Amino acid sequence: MSKKIKQELENNKLSKRLRHAVGDAINDFNMIEPGDKIMVCLSGGKDSYALLDILRRLQASAPIDFQLVAVNLDQKQPGFPEEVLPTYLESIGVPYKIVEEDTYSTVKRVLDEGKTTCSLCSRLRRGILYRTAKELGCTKIALGHHRDDILATLFLNMFYGGKLKAMPPKLVSDNGEHIVIRPLAYVKEKDLIKYAELKQFPIIPCNLCGSQPNLQRQVIGDMLRDWDKRFPGRIESMFSALQNVVPSHLADTELFDFVGLERGQSLKHGGDLAFDSEKMPERFSDGSEEDESEIKIEPQKAERKVINILANKPKACGA
Protein backbone atom coordinates (compact mmCIF):
# COMPACT_ATOMS: atom_id res chain seq x y z
CA MET A 1 0.00 0.00 0.00
CA SER A 2 1.42 3.36 -1.01
CA LYS A 3 2.02 6.09 1.55
CA LYS A 4 -0.57 8.31 -0.14
CA ILE A 5 -3.33 5.67 -0.01
CA LYS A 6 -2.48 4.86 3.60
CA GLN A 7 -2.76 8.55 4.53
CA GLU A 8 -6.12 8.83 2.75
CA LEU A 9 -7.42 5.85 4.75
CA GLU A 10 -6.24 7.43 7.99
CA ASN A 11 -7.92 10.71 7.06
CA ASN A 12 -11.20 8.91 6.34
CA LYS A 13 -11.00 7.12 9.69
CA LEU A 14 -10.40 10.43 11.45
CA SER A 15 -13.38 12.10 9.74
CA LYS A 16 -15.68 9.18 10.60
CA ARG A 17 -14.42 9.06 14.19
CA LEU A 18 -15.14 12.75 14.70
CA ARG A 19 -18.54 12.55 13.02
CA HIS A 20 -19.60 9.65 15.21
CA ALA A 21 -18.22 11.22 18.40
CA VAL A 22 -20.15 14.42 17.74
CA GLY A 23 -23.26 12.51 16.69
CA ASP A 24 -23.15 10.37 19.83
CA ALA A 25 -22.86 13.44 22.06
CA ILE A 26 -25.76 15.13 20.28
CA ASN A 27 -27.89 11.99 20.70
CA ASP A 28 -26.92 11.30 24.32
CA PHE A 29 -27.76 14.82 25.49
CA ASN A 30 -30.52 15.62 22.97
CA MET A 31 -28.56 18.67 21.83
CA ILE A 32 -30.26 19.26 18.49
CA GLU A 33 -34.00 19.04 17.82
CA PRO A 34 -36.12 19.52 14.68
CA GLY A 35 -36.35 23.17 13.66
CA ASP A 36 -33.46 24.36 15.82
CA LYS A 37 -31.52 27.42 14.75
CA ILE A 38 -28.04 26.94 16.13
CA MET A 39 -25.59 29.77 16.67
CA VAL A 40 -22.10 28.31 16.23
CA CYS A 41 -19.57 30.47 18.06
CA LEU A 42 -16.54 30.77 15.81
CA SER A 43 -13.34 32.13 17.33
CA GLY A 44 -10.94 31.29 14.54
CA GLY A 45 -9.33 28.47 16.52
CA LYS A 46 -9.09 24.81 15.50
CA ASP A 47 -11.91 23.66 17.79
CA SER A 48 -14.63 26.02 16.58
CA TYR A 49 -13.65 25.50 12.94
CA ALA A 50 -13.98 21.73 13.41
CA LEU A 51 -17.29 22.17 15.23
CA LEU A 52 -18.79 24.16 12.37
CA ASP A 53 -17.41 21.79 9.74
CA ILE A 54 -18.76 18.64 11.43
CA LEU A 55 -22.17 20.20 12.15
CA ARG A 56 -22.45 21.20 8.48
CA ARG A 57 -21.76 17.61 7.43
CA LEU A 58 -24.33 16.28 9.88
CA GLN A 59 -26.82 18.90 8.73
CA ALA A 60 -26.49 17.62 5.16
CA SER A 61 -27.29 14.02 6.10
CA ALA A 62 -29.35 14.15 9.32
CA PRO A 63 -33.00 12.99 9.31
CA ILE A 64 -34.08 16.32 10.83
CA ASP A 65 -33.85 19.90 9.58
CA PHE A 66 -31.94 22.52 11.53
CA GLN A 67 -30.22 25.79 10.68
CA LEU A 68 -26.68 26.94 11.38
CA VAL A 69 -25.42 30.50 11.69
CA ALA A 70 -21.80 31.26 12.53
CA VAL A 71 -21.06 34.15 14.88
CA ASN A 72 -17.67 35.67 15.59
CA LEU A 73 -16.97 38.25 18.25
CA ASP A 74 -14.37 40.73 17.03
CA GLN A 75 -12.90 41.93 20.33
CA LYS A 76 -10.71 44.56 18.63
CA GLN A 77 -7.44 42.92 19.54
CA PRO A 78 -4.47 44.65 17.91
CA GLY A 79 -3.47 42.86 14.73
CA PHE A 80 -6.65 40.76 14.49
CA PRO A 81 -7.07 39.79 10.79
CA GLU A 82 -10.67 40.95 10.25
CA GLU A 83 -10.94 39.56 6.72
CA VAL A 84 -10.07 35.91 7.48
CA LEU A 85 -13.38 34.65 8.90
CA PRO A 86 -15.73 36.47 6.48
CA THR A 87 -13.68 35.18 3.55
CA TYR A 88 -13.75 31.61 4.86
CA LEU A 89 -17.47 31.63 5.74
CA GLU A 90 -18.47 33.10 2.38
CA SER A 91 -16.37 30.46 0.60
CA ILE A 92 -18.31 27.62 2.27
CA GLY A 93 -21.70 29.34 2.06
CA VAL A 94 -22.51 29.55 5.77
CA PRO A 95 -24.68 32.45 7.04
CA TYR A 96 -22.70 34.50 9.54
CA LYS A 97 -22.58 37.59 11.69
CA ILE A 98 -19.49 39.43 12.92
CA VAL A 99 -20.16 41.22 16.22
CA GLU A 100 -17.76 44.08 16.93
CA GLU A 101 -17.24 44.86 20.62
CA ASP A 102 -14.04 46.34 22.05
CA THR A 103 -13.73 43.99 25.03
CA TYR A 104 -9.95 44.01 24.59
CA SER A 105 -9.62 47.60 25.83
CA THR A 106 -12.03 46.91 28.70
CA VAL A 107 -10.03 43.91 29.90
CA LYS A 108 -6.72 45.76 29.63
CA ARG A 109 -8.12 48.80 31.44
CA VAL A 110 -9.75 46.93 34.31
CA LEU A 111 -7.09 44.31 35.07
CA ASP A 112 -3.61 44.98 36.43
CA GLU A 113 -0.63 44.06 34.28
CA GLY A 114 0.30 40.41 34.74
CA LYS A 115 -3.19 39.30 35.81
CA THR A 116 -4.81 36.56 33.75
CA THR A 117 -7.60 37.88 31.57
CA CYS A 118 -9.62 34.70 30.95
CA SER A 119 -12.27 35.07 33.65
CA LEU A 120 -13.27 38.66 32.83
CA CYS A 121 -12.94 38.14 29.09
CA SER A 122 -15.15 35.05 29.31
CA ARG A 123 -17.90 36.90 31.20
CA LEU A 124 -17.89 39.78 28.72
CA ARG A 125 -18.00 37.42 25.74
CA ARG A 126 -20.79 35.35 27.25
CA GLY A 127 -23.07 38.35 27.72
CA ILE A 128 -22.50 39.57 24.18
CA LEU A 129 -23.07 36.12 22.67
CA TYR A 130 -26.30 35.62 24.65
CA ARG A 131 -27.57 38.97 23.41
CA THR A 132 -26.63 38.11 19.83
CA ALA A 133 -28.37 34.72 20.00
CA LYS A 134 -31.55 36.46 21.10
CA GLU A 135 -31.29 39.02 18.29
CA LEU A 136 -30.82 36.25 15.71
CA GLY A 137 -33.66 34.12 17.09
CA CYS A 138 -31.37 31.17 17.79
CA THR A 139 -32.64 28.29 19.91
CA LYS A 140 -29.23 26.82 20.77
CA ILE A 141 -25.70 28.19 21.22
CA ALA A 142 -22.94 25.76 20.20
CA LEU A 143 -19.48 26.11 21.76
CA GLY A 144 -16.29 24.33 20.71
CA HIS A 145 -15.14 22.87 24.02
CA HIS A 146 -13.87 19.28 23.71
CA ARG A 147 -13.31 16.34 26.05
CA ASP A 148 -9.92 17.61 27.26
CA ASP A 149 -11.43 21.03 28.08
CA ILE A 150 -14.08 19.32 30.20
CA LEU A 151 -11.49 17.31 32.13
CA ALA A 152 -9.24 20.36 32.55
CA THR A 153 -12.18 22.25 34.06
CA LEU A 154 -12.80 19.35 36.45
CA PHE A 155 -9.24 19.52 37.76
CA LEU A 156 -9.19 23.33 37.88
CA ASN A 157 -12.28 23.27 40.09
CA MET A 158 -10.84 20.55 42.31
CA PHE A 159 -7.39 22.10 42.66
CA TYR A 160 -8.36 25.76 42.94
CA GLY A 161 -12.11 25.93 43.61
CA GLY A 162 -12.78 23.08 46.02
CA LYS A 163 -15.60 21.77 43.83
CA LEU A 164 -16.26 18.50 42.04
CA LYS A 165 -17.52 20.31 38.96
CA ALA A 166 -16.67 20.10 35.29
CA MET A 167 -18.09 21.64 32.11
CA PRO A 168 -21.52 20.23 31.12
CA PRO A 169 -22.19 19.12 27.53
CA LYS A 170 -25.53 20.94 27.74
CA LEU A 171 -26.83 23.66 30.06
CA VAL A 172 -29.41 26.39 30.47
CA SER A 173 -28.05 29.91 30.97
CA ASP A 174 -28.49 31.59 34.36
CA ASN A 175 -31.34 33.75 33.06
CA GLY A 176 -33.08 30.69 31.63
CA GLU A 177 -33.25 32.14 28.12
CA HIS A 178 -30.58 30.12 26.31
CA ILE A 179 -29.54 26.48 25.89
CA VAL A 180 -25.80 26.06 25.42
CA ILE A 181 -24.48 22.87 23.82
CA ARG A 182 -20.99 21.42 23.46
CA PRO A 183 -21.17 18.87 20.61
CA LEU A 184 -17.40 18.18 20.83
CA ALA A 185 -17.78 16.83 24.39
CA TYR A 186 -16.65 13.32 23.37
CA VAL A 187 -13.87 14.48 21.01
CA LYS A 188 -10.16 14.22 21.84
CA GLU A 189 -8.11 17.36 21.36
CA LYS A 190 -5.38 15.44 19.53
CA ASP A 191 -7.96 14.42 16.91
CA LEU A 192 -8.97 18.06 16.46
CA ILE A 193 -5.33 19.01 15.91
CA LYS A 194 -5.05 16.38 13.16
CA TYR A 195 -8.36 17.47 11.64
CA ALA A 196 -7.30 21.12 11.49
CA GLU A 197 -4.14 20.08 9.65
CA LEU A 198 -6.15 17.91 7.27
CA LYS A 199 -8.70 20.64 6.50
CA GLN A 200 -6.19 23.49 6.46
CA PHE A 201 -8.43 25.81 8.47
CA PRO A 202 -7.23 29.46 8.47
CA ILE A 203 -6.35 29.49 12.18
CA ILE A 204 -6.33 32.83 14.00
CA PRO A 205 -4.20 32.82 17.19
CA CYS A 206 -5.64 34.42 20.34
CA ASN A 207 -3.05 36.96 21.47
CA LEU A 208 -5.22 38.12 24.36
CA CYS A 209 -5.23 34.93 26.43
CA GLY A 210 -3.33 32.15 24.70
CA SER A 211 0.06 33.76 25.24
CA GLN A 212 -0.29 34.42 28.97
CA PRO A 213 2.48 32.77 31.01
CA ASN A 214 1.71 30.38 33.88
CA LEU A 215 -1.95 30.09 32.92
CA GLN A 216 -3.52 27.53 35.27
CA ARG A 217 -5.53 25.92 32.47
CA GLN A 218 -2.37 25.51 30.40
CA VAL A 219 -0.60 23.81 33.31
CA ILE A 220 -3.54 21.41 33.77
CA GLY A 221 -3.58 20.76 30.02
CA ASP A 222 0.11 19.87 30.06
CA MET A 223 -0.56 17.48 32.95
CA LEU A 224 -3.35 15.72 31.04
CA ARG A 225 -1.24 15.41 27.88
CA ASP A 226 1.61 13.95 29.92
CA TRP A 227 -0.74 11.40 31.51
CA ASP A 228 -2.13 10.49 28.09
CA LYS A 229 1.38 9.70 26.83
CA ARG A 230 2.58 7.81 29.90
CA PHE A 231 -0.64 6.06 30.91
CA PRO A 232 -2.72 5.07 27.85
CA GLY A 233 -6.41 4.86 28.71
CA ARG A 234 -6.25 7.08 31.78
CA ILE A 235 -7.94 10.06 30.11
CA GLU A 236 -10.73 7.85 28.76
CA SER A 237 -11.24 6.35 32.22
CA MET A 238 -11.41 9.78 33.85
CA PHE A 239 -14.01 11.02 31.39
CA SER A 240 -16.01 7.83 31.90
CA ALA A 241 -16.02 8.65 35.62
CA LEU A 242 -17.96 11.84 34.86
CA GLN A 243 -20.73 9.63 33.47
CA ASN A 244 -20.70 7.17 36.38
CA VAL A 245 -21.24 9.22 39.53
CA VAL A 246 -22.13 7.47 42.81
CA PRO A 247 -23.41 10.15 45.25
CA SER A 248 -23.58 7.67 48.15
CA HIS A 249 -19.80 7.27 47.97
CA LEU A 250 -18.87 10.93 47.94
CA ALA A 251 -19.27 13.38 50.85
CA ASP A 252 -21.85 15.94 49.73
CA THR A 253 -24.68 15.99 52.27
CA GLU A 254 -26.91 17.93 49.86
CA LEU A 255 -26.41 15.36 47.13
CA PHE A 256 -27.06 12.33 49.32
CA ASP A 257 -29.02 11.86 52.55
CA PHE A 258 -26.30 10.50 54.84
CA VAL A 259 -28.19 11.75 57.91
CA GLY A 260 -31.22 9.65 57.05
CA LEU A 261 -29.31 6.39 56.54
CA GLU A 262 -30.66 3.52 58.64
CA ARG A 263 -29.81 -0.13 59.18
CA GLY A 264 -31.50 -2.50 56.77
CA GLN A 265 -31.67 0.15 54.09
CA SER A 266 -30.35 -0.97 50.70
CA LEU A 267 -28.36 1.45 48.58
CA LYS A 268 -28.78 1.75 44.84
CA HIS A 269 -25.09 1.18 44.15
CA GLY A 270 -24.26 -0.91 47.21
CA GLY A 271 -22.86 0.04 50.61
CA ASP A 272 -19.39 -1.18 51.52
CA LEU A 273 -19.67 -3.79 48.74
CA ALA A 274 -19.20 -1.00 46.21
CA PHE A 275 -15.57 -0.75 47.33
CA ASP A 276 -15.06 -4.28 45.99
CA SER A 277 -16.37 -3.42 42.55
CA GLU A 278 -13.47 -1.41 41.17
CA LYS A 279 -13.35 -2.02 37.46
CA MET A 280 -10.45 -4.25 36.50
CA PRO A 281 -8.93 -4.84 33.06
CA GLU A 282 -10.78 -7.30 30.82
CA ARG A 283 -8.05 -9.84 31.51
CA PHE A 284 -5.83 -10.00 34.54
CA SER A 285 -2.08 -10.25 34.16
CA ASP A 286 -2.27 -14.05 34.54
CA GLY A 287 -4.73 -14.28 31.65
CA SER A 288 -7.76 -15.20 33.76
CA GLU A 289 -11.16 -13.72 32.99
CA GLU A 290 -12.60 -10.85 34.99
CA ASP A 291 -14.86 -11.87 37.88
CA GLU A 292 -18.43 -11.85 36.56
CA SER A 293 -19.76 -11.05 40.03
CA GLU A 294 -18.43 -7.49 39.79
CA ILE A 295 -21.09 -4.92 40.60
CA LYS A 296 -21.77 -2.85 37.49
CA ILE A 297 -22.56 0.83 38.00
CA GLU A 298 -24.65 2.15 35.15
CA PRO A 299 -25.79 5.77 34.73
CA GLN A 300 -29.56 6.26 34.94
CA LYS A 301 -31.08 7.94 31.89
CA ALA A 302 -34.47 9.58 31.62
CA GLU A 303 -37.03 7.99 29.33
CA ARG A 304 -37.24 10.14 26.20
CA LYS A 305 -37.50 9.84 22.46
CA VAL A 306 -34.42 11.12 20.65
CA ILE A 307 -33.90 11.26 16.89
CA ASN A 308 -30.59 9.70 15.85
CA ILE A 309 -28.62 12.56 14.30
CA LEU A 310 -26.32 10.03 12.60
CA ALA A 311 -29.18 8.45 10.65
CA ASN A 312 -29.61 9.45 7.03
CA LYS A 313 -32.29 11.77 5.70
CA PRO A 314 -35.38 9.85 4.53
CA LYS A 315 -35.48 9.44 0.76
CA ALA A 316 -38.25 11.13 -1.19
CA CYS A 317 -40.97 8.92 -2.68
CA GLY A 318 -39.82 7.38 -5.95
CA ALA A 319 -36.17 8.20 -5.25
Curated annotation (Swiss-Prot):
Q: Into which EC class is this enzyme placed?
A: transferase
Q: Under which name does UniProt file this protein?
A: tRNA-cytidine(32) 2-sulfurtransferase
- An MF annotation (GO) of this entry: magnesium ion binding
Q: Name one GO cellular component term.
A: cytoplasm
Q: Which Pfam families match?
A: ATP_bind_3
* Cofactor(s) annotated in UniProt: Mg(2+); [4Fe-4S] cluster
Tell me the keywords, alphabetical order.
4Fe-4S, ATP-binding, Cytoplasm, Iron, Iron-sulfur, Magnesium, Metal-binding, Nucleotide-binding, RNA-binding, Transferase, tRNA processing, tRNA-binding
Where would one find the signal peptide in this protein? none
Q: Which residues participate in [4Fe-4S] cluster binding? A: C118, C121, C209
Quaternary structure and interacting proteins, as annotated: Homodimer.
Entry keyword Metal-binding: yes
Taxon lineage = Bacteria, Pseudomonadati, Pseudomonadota, Betaproteobacteria, Neisseriales
Span of the annotated motif PP-loop motif: 43-48
Question: What InterPro entries does the record tag this protein with?
Answer: Rossmann-like_a/b/a_fold, TilS/TtcA_N, tRNA_Cyd_32_2_STrfase, tRNA_thiolation_TtcA_Ctu1
Q: Using the UniProt record, give the first listed, main subcellular location.
A: cytoplasm
Quickly give the catalysed reaction: cytidine(32) in tRNA + S-sulfanyl-L-cysteinyl-[cysteine desulfurase] + AH2 + ATP = 2-thiocytidine(32) in tRNA + L-cysteinyl-[cysteine desulfurase] + A + AMP + diphosphate + H(+)
This molecule's function is given as: Catalyzes the ATP-dependent 2-thiolation of cytidine in position 32 of tRNA, to form 2-thiocytidine (s(2)C32). The sulfur atoms are provided by the cysteine/cysteine desulfurase (IscS) system.
**Which pathway does the record list?**
tRNA modification
Relay the cofactor remark from the entry: Binds 1 [4Fe-4S] cluster per subunit. The cluster is chelated by three Cys residues, the fourth Fe has a free coordination site that may bind a sulfur atom transferred from the persulfide of IscS.
**Family per similarity comment:** Belongs to the TtcA family.
